[in-house]
Regions:
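Membrane-interfacial amphipathic/re-entrant helices at transmembrane-helix boundaries
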Residues: 1-13, 55, 84
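Short loop segments and helix-boundary regions at transmembrane helix junctions
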Residues: 20-33, 43-109, 205-217, 234-237, ...
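Cytosolic-side transmembrane-helix boundaries in multi-pass membrane proteins
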Residues: 32, 48, 242-274
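Loop-to-transmembrane alpha-helix initiation sites
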Residues: 55-62, 85, 89, 128, ...
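Helix-loop-helix "hairpin" substructures at the membrane interface of multi-pass membrane proteins
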Residues: 125-201
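Transmembrane alpha-helical segments in multi-pass inner-membrane proteins
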Residues: 192-243
Length: 274
């Protein structure tokens, strides 16, 4: 349990930050679509009997993810008759179906489909944790250096256009780096857990705070709590770790949403009395 706990402590901080960007952009399902594209690349590697932790497998998965980054940056036009969420949904469904088709030809297809969805974070190794932590730290520094442009495009898209930013270029850069992070994490965590780490803590932070810094702090706490609690639940009750963490996140989101509604009702009641 030690290294899975270390992974749940060291790795989610960047996912929460990227999740805030995704939620503010209003393209919630882009993360699960990108994760599924990375998983499709891994399925290709499985079909050709490549080592899953090899650089070749990582390169194939990253190539599929970058293809998705290119598609989503092109389709995210300022004015378009087709909503980008429709393109994202289509990409996810096609990638998921293609993955199932590929794994149907693999010797251990059923097991790989399960790993693709929920991963097996209990089997994470020290090398996998430190490699991903180093990558996430590099991406975090990259985002910090370019934070003004990234934040402007995500949080004030019209303002970015008015200031003359090449929004499509910044979109591709964001999606490409985002895809790099997703590709590295999806192998140990699975598609559903990647989606949960990206979206649920960010939504919890938005429910409880207005300032971006406070949302990040709340999101980090929720990611830490949900990950560790889910791991212990899976250990005590002999449950799949990824699915247990996802369901724990769901329970936390329900509780926080109810608390946020109660808080809003309380504020309105006080305002009416005054």
């Amino acid at each position: 349990m030690f290294w899975p706990i270390v992974a749940c402590v060291l790795l989610p901080w960047l996912l929460v930050y990227l999740g805030l960007h995704v939620v503010q952009r209003g393209i919630i399902f882009i993360d699960i679509a990108m994760a599924q594209m990375a998983a499709l690349g891994i399925c290709v590697a499985v079909l050709f009997r490549l080592e899953l932790e090899s650089w070749t497998t990582f390169g194939i998965a990253l190539a599929f993810t970058l293809a998705g980054a290119g598609i989503f940056s092109v389709t995210g036009k300022r004015t378009s008759q087709i909503p980008q969420e429709a393109v994202i949904g289509i990409a996810y469904v096609v990638a998921a179906a293609a993955a199932v088709l590929l794994l149907s030809r693999a010797a251990e297809g059923d097991e790989e489909i399960k790993n693709m969805l929920v991963g097996n974070i209990l089997l994470v190794t020290p090398r996998e944790v430190w490699e991903r932590f180093a990558l996430f730290a590099a991406v975090g520094i990259f985002h910090f250096v370019l934070r003004r442009s990234f934040l402007l495009v995500s949080f004030d898209r019209e303002g970015a256009y008015q200031k003359g930013l090449r929004v499509r270029y910044w979109d591709f850069l964001f999606y490409a780096v985002f895809g790099l992070v997703v590709t590295s994490f999806v192998r140990i965590a699975g598609v559903l857990l990647v989606f949960s780490y990206l979206i649920v803590p960010a939504v919890c932070g938005i429910n409880l705070a207005q300032r971006t810094v406070n949302r990040l702090l709340i999101g980090w706490f929720i990611a830490l709590l949900g990950g560790i609690a889910g791991l212990f639940l899976s250990y005590w009750w002999d449950l799949p770790s990824g699915a247990a963490i996802v369901c724990t996140f769901g329970a936390l989101l329900i509780l926080i949403s109810l608390f946020a509604l109660w808080q809003q009702h309380r504020v309105r009641s006080v305002a009416i009395q005054d």
